[in-house]
Regions:
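Gly/Ser-rich helix-loop-strand patches that form or flank binding pockets
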Residues: 67, 71-89
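N-terminal glycine-/serine-/threonine-rich phosphate-binding loop
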Residues: 1-60, 64-74
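Short, charged/polar low-complexity linear motifs in solvent-exposed/disordered segments
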Residues: 32-33, 84, 106-109
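Short, structured patches in soluble enzyme cores that scaffold and shape functional sites
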Residues: 8, 84, 122-124
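Flexible, glycine/proline-enriched loop segments at strand-loop-helix junctions
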Residues: 9-12, 86-92
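Residue-level signature of transmembrane alpha-helix interfaces in integral membrane proteins
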Residues: 19, 25, 77, 99-104
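Catalytic core of DAGKc-family lipid kinases
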Residues: 89-124
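Short beta-strand segments
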Residues: 58-60, 81, 121
Length: 124
């Protein structure tokens, strides 16, 4: 993968220190990233995902991942949750392992990483 869409929970990364660290690592790999554009309530603005993006990295917790899934309904974008909280069931990568996960996504480990493709149920 060559291009990432970064979705940050600013309540868990107020000064964007973690986001900056992850974006810098992506750049070191020679890859591109785009920070999600959000409205005043923190929802991702519709139609703002660049067409060349291949994967969304969701920095937060399970709630952040669920919100991203809802906000990106209709987009064919796999998401990988990077947990910035204490416990995450859906956000499967712990912060300490973000470099390994990005390496795998970039193909350097020559192994596939399972990306979560969740769809919002019509009942929710």
């Amino acid at each position: 993968m060559d291009s990432f869409y970064i979705i940050t929970n600013i309540l868990k990364d107020k000064d964007y220190a973690v986001t900056d660290k992850i974006c810098n690592y992506i750049e070191q790999k020679g890859k591109k990233w785009t920070l999600a554009k959000k409205d005043e309530e923190g929802h991702i603005l519709p139609g703002t995902v660049p067409s060349d993006v291949e994967c969304g990295l969701v920095l937060g917790g399970d709630g952040t991942l669920i919100r991203a899934i809802r906000d990106l309904e209709g987009e064919e974008l796999p998401l990988l949750g990077i947990n910035l909280g204490t416990l995450g069931y859906l956000a499967e990568v712990e912060l300490k392992d973000y470099q390994y996960a990005i390496d795998r996504l970039c193909g350097e480990e020559h192994a596939a990483i399972e990306l979560r493709m969740m769809q919002r149920s019509s009942n929710t």
